Amino acid sequence: MPRIMIKGGVWRNTEDEILKAAVMKYGKNQWSRIASLLHRKSAKQCKARWYEWLDPSIKKTEWSREEEEKLLHLAKLMPTQWRTIAPIIGRTAAQCLEHYEFLLDKAAQRDNEEETTDDPRKLKPGEIDPNPETKPARPDPIDMDEDELEMLSEARARLANTQGKKAKRKAREKQLEEARRLAALQKRRELRAAGIEIQKKRKKKRGVDYNAEIPFEKKPALGFYDTSEENYQTLDADFRKLRQQDLDGELRSEKEGRDRKKDKQHLKRKKESDLPSAILQTSGVSEFTKKRSKLVLPAPQISDAELQEVVKVGQASEIARQTAEESGITNSASSTLLSEYNVTNNSIALRTPRTPASQDRILQEAQNLMALTNVDTPLKGGLNTPLHESDFSGVTPQRQVVQTPNTVLSTPFRTPSHGSEGLTPRSGTTPKPVINSTPGRTPLRDKLNINPEDGMADYSDPSYVKQMERESREHLRLGLLGLPAPKNDFEIVLPENAEKELEEREIDDTYIEDAADVDARKQAIRDAERVKEMKRMHKAVQKDLPRPSEVNETILRPLNVEPPLTDLQKSEELIKKEMITMLHYDLLHHPYEPSGNKKGKTVGFGTNNAEHIAYLEHNPYEKFSKEELKKAQDVLVQEMEVVKQGMSHGELSSEAYNQVWEECYSQVLYLPGQSRYTRANLASKKDRIESLEKRLEINRGHMTTEAKRAAKMEKKMKILLGGYQSRAMGLMKQLNDLWDQIEQAYLELRTFEELKKHEDSAIPRRLECLKEDVQRQQEREKELQHRYADLLLEKETLKAKF
C-alpha cells in the first residue's frame, strides 16, 4: 500500500526561509508555484503562513492595555467578526482571536480563584496545534533528514536560477548574431584590401541603423572658421592612478581592519588616561546603568506675583481692622466690612482629597463577555444576567482620565452647595435637615455673605428667585440707609517694613535666575550690539544693495599731471580714494552674497582677500563715531539745499522721476558673459542679445515664482472659500431650477387660460346641439310610443277575433 503524505504540521526554520525567498522571487499571487518548493506544505498553508506570521507588517510585540480594552470593546460590538476587528487594532485575526480567548480563560481562572502563572492556552503534552501557521518556527536540527536536505538543495537551485530557458535562448541567439556580423565585416575588409568591392545589401529597417549612420549628426556649414580660441588641454595621464586597486577602490576588509586598529588604539589610550571608565566599558557594567528619567512637574496654578498680591491685600485688611479696633469703632457696619478671614481650619487644609479607586476594566469586560456567552435561552424566563457597567457609546472604549483634585483654587470658607461634596469624607460636619441631600460642612463665618447657603434653595422656581431678589434689594437698601456719615479724616500710612522689604529684594542675591531667562537676556544684548554694529556700517551694507566684486582703482587721476589739479579736482580725488578704501573694507569684512545663491556660498568673493588686506595696510580704514557721522550727514543736507537753491531745482513729481529713471536705466546694459555693466551704446549686437536673453531668463524665473505663489494662494483660497463656492453653486442651481419651474408654470397658466377661452366659446354651441338631440329623441320616442300603442291595439283586436 503506498504511503499517504498528509501536508501540514509545525513549520521549521528552513521552510520559513525558503518561503520568504520564494515570495521575493514569485510574488504573493503564485502560491502553487511557491508550495512546489515545500514538499510538506500546501499552497493554502504557505499563504496562511505568510499572512499570519512572516509578513513584515505583522505586529508581534506584547499587547498593551489600550489594545486589550479596544479588543474586548470591539468583540462586544461585533462578535466573531475578527477579520473586521483585526485592522482596527493593528493585529491579525488569529492574534485577536487567540488573545481574546486568553483573556476569557484568565477571567475564568480568576472567578474560580485559580491563580496560576501558566498560560491557560498553552498546549498540553500530546495535543496537536490546530493553527501552526501562527506560531514561531521550530529550529533546524543539526542532522537533517535526507528529504529535507533534498528539498533545500532543490529550492536553492530553483531560486538561484534567475534566467529561464527563454532568456538563455535569446542570449544565445544574440551572441550568434554578433559573431555572424563580425565574420561578415572581416570578410568585407579582406576583400576590400584585395581590391574587390562588394556592395552591401542593406535590409530596410524601420529604425536607425546605428552601425552605418551617425545619430544626431550636425554637419558644419561650408566656409572657414577662426580656430584660435579652440585651446585644447593636453591629456596629462597619471598612470600611477590607473592601477587595479585604485580603480576598484578601498576593499571592505581593509576598511574594517583599519577601523579595528583605530578602536584598539583608542581603547589603549583610554586605559592609560581613564582606567575606571575603561574597565566599566570592557566589563559591560555600563550596560546596566539606568539613566535617571526627567522630573516632570505640573505647571504652577498661581504665579508668584498673584501670591504677593494676595499677601498685600491680606496685610492691608489686617492693618485696617487693627486701626479700627484701636480707634474704638465698634459699629455693625465697620465690623461687617472688616471681618476676619485669616483663621483657617487646619484639619481641612491638611486633608488631601483622594482620587477615585480605579477598576480593572479589562477584567470586567472579559467577565461580561463570558457571562453573555454562557446565557441560557430567554424562553426559560427569569432575571437577566448580572453584568458590570458597560459602554456602547462608540467604536473605541472611553478612557477614564484621573485628575488630581485642585485644593488651591477653592474658596477657604466656601459653604458646600447641594451636590458639591468632595472626594474625601469630611469630619466635624453637621448633616443638613434636607431629605436625600449630601451631608455638608458646618457653615463658617461669612458676614459679607460671599458664599450663600444654596443647599436648600430651589432655583428652578421663578417665583422663589424673584422673592430672593426682592429680599436682597430690601436688605441692601436698609444697610445703605444705616451707614454713618462719612468722615474725611483718613490718612495713608506706609507699613514700617515696606522700605526694608524693598532693600532686601535689591540686596538678595540667593535668587537663581532661570537659564532660559539668562539666555534670553544674553540674546537681547547680542541683538542690540548687532543693531548698533549695523548702524555703523555703510548704507549699501545696511540695505544689502549689490556691490562690485572687484575694485576699479584706475578711476584715480595721477597727481603729477600737467596742468596741475585744481582744488575741486583734488577734493574729488580724495572722495574717490575714500570710496575705494570703503569698497576694499566691505569686500573684506562684509562680502556681498546674492539673494539667488541658495547654497549660501559667496560667488566670486573671498579670493582677493590678500589684495584687500594689502591695500588697507597702505591706506588704513578709519572708523568714525555716531556723532561724527551725524555731523557729516548734516553738512551733506545743507550742501544739498545750497545746490538745490543755486540750480533752481524744484520738487520732482513721481512721473518725472520715473521717466528720468527709465531713461538712465535704459542706457545701462548688463553683460552676463563678463559679469559687469556697461553703456548700451558701447555694446555690440551680440552683447545686447545676450543681455536680453539673460533678462528674459530672469523674467521667466520671476514669472515661474509668481505663478507658484499664485497657485499656492489659489489653493489656500480654495481651501478657505471652497465651502462658500460649493454653497453658491448649489444656490445658483436651485435658483435656475426655480426659474425653470416658474417659466413652466407660466406656460401652463397661459395654456389653461387659452383653453378656458375656447371652452367658454364652445360650451353654448354644445348645449344647443345637445338640446336639439334631446328634442329629436323625445319626438322619436313619442312616435314610437304611438306606434307601439297602435300595434298593441291591433294585437288585442286579432286575439278577440280568433
Swiss-Prot record:
Residue segments, region Interaction with PLRG1: 706-800
A GO BP annotation: regulation of transcription by RNA polymerase II
Pfam families in alphabetical order: Myb_Cef, Myb_DNA-bind_6
Basic and acidic residues: compositionally biased ranges: 118-127, 246-262
Annotated coiled-coil segments of the chain: 142-245, 676-701, 764-802
Renumbered residue ranges of the record's region Interaction with PPP1R8: 260-606
GO molecular function: DNA-binding transcription activator activity, RNA polymerase II-specific; DNA-binding transcription factor activity, RNA polymerase II-specific; identical protein binding; RNA binding; RNA polymerase II transcription regulatory region sequence-specific DNA binding; WD40-repeat domain binding
Localization per record: Nucleus; Nucleus speckle; Cytoplasm
Required for interaction with CTNNBL1: region residues: 200-206
Annotated HTH myb-type domain residues: 1-56, 57-108
Motif (Nuclear localization signal): 165-271
Location of the region described as Interaction with DAPK3 in the Swiss-Prot/TrEMBL record: 501-659
Residues with PTM Phosphoserine: 303, 358, 417, 437
DNA-binding region: 31-54, 82-104
Keyword annotations of the record: Activator, Cell cycle, Coiled coil, Cytoplasm, DNA damage, DNA repair, DNA-binding, Isopeptide bond, mRNA processing, mRNA splicing, Nucleus, Phosphoprotein, Repeat, RNA-binding, Spliceosome, Transcription, Transcription regulation, Ubl conjugation
Complex and partners: Homodimer. Interacts with DAPK3. Component of the precatalytic, catalytic and postcatalytic spliceosome complexes. Part of a spliceosomal 'core' complex consisting of CDC5L, PLRG1, SPF27, CCAP1, CCAP3 and CCAP6. Interacts with PLRG1, Lodestar/TTF2, and NIPP1/PPP1R8. Component of the minor spliceosome, which splices U12-type introns. Within this complex, interacts with SCNM1. Component of the PRP19-CDC5L splicing complex composed of a core complex comprising a homotetramer of PRPF19, CDC5L, PLRG1 and BCAS2, and at least three less stably associated proteins CTNNBL1, CWC15 and HSPA8.
Family: Belongs to the CEF1 family.
Designated name of the protein: Cell division cycle 5-like protein
Gene (UniProt): CDC5L
